[in-house]
Amino acid sequence: MRRVAIGLFFLSGAAGLVYEVVWLRLLVLVFGSAHFAVTAILTAFMAGLALGAFVIGRWVDRTPHHPLAVYGVLEIGVGASALTVPMLVGGIRPVLAALPDALGASFYTESLLRFLLALAVLLVPTTLLGGTLPVLSRLVRGSVGSAGAGVGGLYAVNVAGAVLGVVVTGFVVLPLAGAALTRTAAAAVNVPHALPSLAASRA
C-alpha cells in the first residue's frame, strides 16, 4: 500500500504543477499582465492547499472510508474541475471587459475584482489537491513506524513530481502540444491514476 501511495502522489504532484503552468497562461489573458496572473495563481494554490489540508484532513480522520478510496475520488474531482477552468475563465472575460464601463471602477478596484473572480475559479481544484496529502498521510502513518519519516517522504515524492511536471510542461509539452492539449493530458493523468487507488482500496 505504501508503494502505491508513493507512486500515486508523485503523479499527483506532476499533474498539479502542469495545471499551475497552464493556468498562468490563461490568467495572463484575464489580467493582461503576468505580474497579476502570478499573484492570483500563487494565492489560489496556497489558499486551496491550506483549505483542503485543513477541511479534508479533519474529515478523513473521522471517516470509515479507506484512504485510497477517498484519494481516488479527490483525484477524479481534481481532473474534472480542472477541465472546467478554461470554460470558466472564458465566461468571466466578457464580464471583466464590461466592468470599467458598468461600474466606473478604478484600476485598483477592477484589479481586485479580477483577482477575486480568478481565485473563485481556481479554488475548487486547488482545495481538492490540498486534501490529497492528509488523506495519503493517514495511509502511510498506518504502515510505517515513524509518522514523521513516512509523511516527510510522501511530501518529498510529491515535490519531486511537481518539479518534473514544471520542467516537462515548460520545456517540452507546451511548446510541442499547446495549452489545450497540455491541460487535457494533465486531467488524463488525474482520472486514470485514481482508478488504481479505488481498486487497491478494495483489495
Residue ranges and their predicted role:
Residues 1-203:
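Alpha-helical transmembrane segments of multi-pass membrane proteins
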